[in-house]
Structure formats: C-alpha cells, structure tokens
Amino acid sequence: MRRSLPARLAVWAVLAAALSSASAAEAADPPTGQYRAFWVDTFNTNLSDHADVLAVVNNARAARANALFAQVRRRGDSWYLDSLEGPAEIVAPAKPLAPGFDPLADLITEAHAAGIEVHAFVIAAAIWNRHPTILAPPAWPDHPFNRHGFNQATGALYTERDNWLTRTLIPDGTASVTFSGTRIGAEFWVDFGHPDAAAYTADVLTHLVERYDVDGLHLDRIRYPEITIAGQTPTSGTSIGYNETSVARFNQHYGRTAGTNPAQNDPLWNQWRRDQVTNVVRRIYLGSIAINPQVKISGSLIAFGGGPTTEASWNSAEAYWRVYQDWRAWTEEGILDIAAPMAYKAEHTATIRPQWDQWSEWTKNHAYNRSTILGQGGLVNAIEGSLRQVRRAFTPSAAGNYASGLSFYSMATSNIAVANNPFSIPAGQSTPVRSFAEFASALTTGRSVDGTRAYEDLAANPVPVFPAEASVPDMPWKSHPVAGHVMGFVRDEAGQVVDTGAVNIAREAGADPPPATRTTIVGATDGGGFYGGVDLAPGTYRVTVTPLGQPAYTTACATDVIAGQVRRFDVTIDREAPTVVLGASPRELWPPNHRTVNVTLAGAAEDAGTGIDSVSFRVLDEYGLVQPEVAPISGGGLPRVDFSQAIPLEATRAGKDKNGRTYTLEVTVTDRACQARTAAVTVVVPHDQGH
C-alpha cells in the first residue's frame, strides 16, 4: 500500500510556538475603520470610457463608500490594457471600449483622487460562456478556451494534457450539462487540478498586480462550479472536477488504477478537489504580496443557504462540500486578507431572513488573523431590508467579534421591487425599484433624496448607517508586520517538478525566541511544484521535502524569513555532494631562500545535480602564520568547473625543523544545494633537498 499525505492538505497543519491571533471564538476589539464597498460588475455596469468611470466614482462618493471591487476579468479577458490576456470580450449591443482606453488605469486615477480604494475583481475559473459552434469563439486567438478548451480547427474539445476544462460525469442533457460534461449551464470552467491551468491563472493575476497600482485583488469563482441536480448532499459529494489530468494525478498519488475515476463521494477525492483550489489561492496570495506587500487579496465566497452554527457544521456548508471552496481554512491559514462571503439573503422573506444572521455570526467569528466583510445582496432586497441588514452587520457577534465592513452587490442593482414589503414605512406597502441615488441617500440620511420619505424608523434609528465618511480598517499584519512568508518551487534530481510532495518548513532550533506566530508549517506542493508558508516567525528556516515514494530530503541551504517580506526559496533535490580532483605543482619548495614561490593549484569540480556554485581556497600553515586570502571562483551552476589557481607561498622554514615546513592547500567545492566537499594537497619546504 502506498504511503500518502494526510487528507487535509488544504489546511496546512500548523505547529506554532504560540499564535498571535485569538481563537476563532475569542472576542476581538471593534475595527477602527469600516469597509464600505460596492461590487461593480461589468456585465451590468459600463466601464467603457472616462464618463463611465466618473459615474462609478461619483456613485461611490454619494454613498460614502471607500472601496470598489471593479470587475476587470470576466471570461479570460481584460478590462485593462497591460495584460497577459486579450481585450475585453464585449458583444453588441453592449457598449464597446473607447479606442486606447484603459478602464482600470482610469478608475485607479479617479478613485484614488477621491480617497476610494480600487480592488481588481477577477473571475478566476469560469473562462467562457457561449456555445463554441453556434456563436463565435473568443476573439483573442490565444484565449485559454481557444488553446485548451474547444479546438475550432477540429470542431472538438482538446484532449489529455491540452484540455484544461473541468468536467462532470453526469451525462450530457442532464442538469444542463453539454459538451461531454465540460459545459455546466452556459459556462466552461478551468480545473485547478490541472497544473497548467493553475499556473496560467496565477501568472495572469500576479501580472495585473505588478502592472497596476491596485489596492487589492478580488477573486471571484475561485472554486468548482455548482451543478443543480437532485440528490446532492454532503454525504454524496458532487460530480465535478473530473479533468483527465487532475484525475491521473490523483490516481498516481494514491496508487489507484490508472484510467479510472474516483467516486464523487470518495473522501480522499473530496479533499483533493479542495486542495487544488486552496493551492491556487495560496499561490496567488504569495505571488501578489511578493510584488506588493501592501496589496490586499480578497475573495467573494460561497454562502449558499443557511450558515454554519457549529464548527462541525462547516463540513455541511455548500462551499465546503459542493464547490470545494474551503474558505474557512483560507482565513485560518492567512491566504486571504479579506474574506467576503456572498450572503445575498432576502430580508423580507421570513424563512430566509435568519440566514443573513447565521452567516454574519460565522463570518465575524472566523477572521482569525485576517479581516472579514459581509457581502450584502441589494439584488434580492428592497432598500428597507438592506438597511436592516447593514445595521446588524456592524454589531458584534455573540462572542464579541466584528466584521470589518461590508460590500454591496451591486452598484448596478442596489435594490429591487418588493410586494407587500414588511419593512416599508408604513409597513406592507409594495415598494418599487428605486434609483441608485435613492439607495445612496438611504445609506447617508435614512431618507429619500427629496427628504419626504423615510426608509427606516427614524425615531428608533436617528443616525443613518453611514452618517459620515469612514476610513478603511487598518490591517496590522501589513502596516506593522511581525511575521514573514516563504514560497518557491520544488524539483527532483531530474529537474521535474515534485507534484504533491510533502513539505515541512521549519525554523532552526536554538534561534532567538520567536514572536507569537508560526515556526513550522506542514503542507505539500501543488501540481506545478509550488509550495508556500504564510505568517512565519522571523528567523532561519530549512525545508524538508518528501516526494511520493522517496525518502525525505532536507535542504542544506537555509533561508532567512523577514517580517513583512516574502522570501523566494526554490528547492532542487540534490542528494550527492560535488566531487573534486586536485593537484599542485610544485609540491616541494627548494631552496629555502625566503623567496615567494607561486604554487599552481589545479583540478576539476563536478556536480551532476544542481551544478557548481563556487570553488574556494584556503592555505593552512603548520607554523600558524596568516596566509594571504585567495578569491573564490564562481561556478555559475555549471556541471563541471576546471580551475587553475596560483597560490603564493614563502620558501622558508625554521633551521632546526628537521621535518620541514608543511603547507596544506584546501579546495572546497559547493553546489547550488549548499552541499560541499573539500580536498587538500600538501606542499613542503624540506629540511634537506629530496627529504
């Protein structure tokens, strides 16, 4: 039976000297600021020219908002010009982008001038939503759907490693499934269990962070798709994630029969799918803050149905078992700065109303060392219902914990009509859809724009929910960091990535006592060999890697973790120290006339693993006199380095030294895995010539 990693790789078991955060249930101080954000979805809000951008910013200002989650990637395309992907896919009659216009750059300029943060809102996994044969394919030839979804030349899906799409085993024609299980409803999704799809997504998004002065990167649909079909339960699992490459990786890792599919309720398969999503979140998080330590990584997270009421009931939440998005583990690990569950609940429906409070309670109690905000759904509420939810969002949980704010979905649909609205004033009136200006006025005054109509009981609530502007909350792990992070890639002796290899990141013993944060993290590499550790105590660390079926390998090199920084520490498994062949000429210095003689130290160093890093020299004199230093030679990672070095030695000895004077010439060869081998030769100044 094959030895495998523990099931909960996604959580990354953490061994800590002490944790700086309180437990999930411990009370926290109320935040000093308050996030007031709007989702700006480009499906329903234009960002096509400067006038559109000004309209969005002015709406935010009117509502006293301080952050915008503005959608700039919908389906593998870009609402920004400096991108690794093609331009925005806009289909008539939607408004096209003005020529040469960069929506994201312009929004950053205008919003920052107004004191408003801009978070780039990106759809991560869903990459295409039109029929590939009836309607036109993506316009950009290198669109991931064109290259790794549907092959227009053959009129068929790509196969094997070339196919990045996730897949259900539910037959086509059932539950709106088509295209051999790869189209769920209207959508095609990439599968993060495919290493190339995960790497591509991380590269696209970290490139955005590198090129734009965004305050944050906001991840949407960072999960598997939900499938609407009867009979799905936490026990049954879901038929999704069956990308051929991901399944092959799973079978290899767990010693399953190649070419077979795991059952949808297989516990190992369930955790595997959660791990694939968690791995890409970790990779995006560390890659982004390595570029800009102050950028805030957030996510719009699944909050279907009612919220968990106990720790154990999280496993029955649909985020966990249906779409394999274990976002509770993400906040605990620290790979999201802001968790924003989409708790879109109709306040006017008595059976649904408690769900808002359940998710509010859970969210406030599960921030750990990070922030949480509540995603409020204007798209399912009248203004009156939304105001009630906002007020409850800013109260503490029963355990005394607070959310850091909330975000409204969306700027385009801030409210809906509600028949017999129980919260209208007076109660029971049918309320129509109101304008965004009315919604903003309700937030800031509690009244309509013209002041004639109240949106809540002003006697009970004399102060509106947003009576004045608010600053965004401080994030002390960014403003005053006490912990650092490490990330890298692991390759084996043949240079191949180590897929799902066990990883242990450990602080060296004997170092200064760390602050109250992590000193050891246990986890695994992803399918591309990526690993990472978050919130480590500053100090010196080594990494131990255990590839499947192989002995553990601990790096001879170490890396220093520094508070507030991400250290890049790649690992190539190299179990053999370099070899060195050494000779010297002359080996005897005669006559002993006190003159300096150049001894040629020549040889060759070889390392078939990581290559030669350096060749260094040392002269030892039995008389104990200090000898001149000799500069080392860089190996440049070459597998072989030939060297010839002149070493100046004094041809002299003590007159009564019958054994003569002995110099020992050492050469130390170090490879790029920090393994070293030393060879030495002796040179003698004899008492008598020939002796």
Model-derived segments and spans:
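Active-site-adjacent "subsite" loops/lids of carbohydrate-active enzymes
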Residues: 31-37, 45-47, 125-207, 211
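Catalytic domains of carbohydrate-active enzymes, especially glycoside hydrolases
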Residues: 52-77, 336-338
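Substrate-binding cleft of secreted/luminal carbohydrate-active enzymes
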Residues: 324-352, 363, 367-475
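Structural motif
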Residues: 487-500
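Short, acidic Ser/Thr/Gly-rich low-complexity loop/linker segments typical of extracellular
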Residues: 497, 501, 507-535
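Short Pro-Gly-centered beta-turn/loop motif in secreted/extracellular proteins
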Residues: 530-542, 548
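Structured interaction patches on ligand/partner-binding surfaces of diverse proteins
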Residues: 548-569
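Proline-threonine-serine-rich low-complexity tracts
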Residues: 574-691
